[in-house]
Amino acid sequence: MPRVKRGVTARARHKKVLKLAKGYYGARSRTYRVAVQAVTKAGQYAYRDRRQKKRQFRQLWIARINAAARQNGLSYSRFINGLKKASIEIDRKILADIAVFDKVVFATLVEKAKEALN
């Protein structure tokens, strides 16, 4: 069998990794060995944070809903309970959006929740 020289493959692999590491600080963007580690770690962070992003946004929405509900004299948990009893099914993302951008509509939702609780 003929000898296989792997220069083309190695060069392509190095180029691919260094392209992914473009913009990194210092040797991380220039040295292949360090760039491989940096790109691998970046991938791990990206994988983890794609999952954390969902949790963090839900936390943000709940904090916004809670703040708006308390301005209207109701705690978050009682507000959500009131909405469920009034059979109003709006998810937290939309509720947070309404709380921030349309305070009048949110106030009416709070009133409906209060009525359902009584």
From Swiss-Prot:
TM helices/strands, residue ranges: none
InterPro entries in the cross-refs: Ribosomal_bL20 (IPR005813), RIBOSOMAL_L20_CS (IPR049946), Ribosomal_protein_bL20_C (IPR035566)
Any single Pfam family the record assigns to this protein: Ribosomal_L20
Keyword Ribosomal protein: yes
GO molecular function annotations of the record: rRNA binding; structural constituent of ribosome
Disulfide bond positions: none
Keyword Repeat belongs to the record: no
Record keywords, A-Z: Ribonucleoprotein, Ribosomal protein, RNA-binding, rRNA-binding
Role: Binds directly to 23S ribosomal RNA and is necessary for the in vitro assembly process of the 50S ribosomal subunit. It is not involved in the protein synthesizing functions of that subunit.
Alphabetical list of NCBIfam families matching this protein: rplT_bact
Family: Belongs to the bacterial ribosomal protein bL20 family.
HAMAP family documented for this protein: Ribosomal_bL20
Protein's UniProt name: Large ribosomal subunit protein bL20
Gene name, Swiss-Prot/TrEMBL: rplT
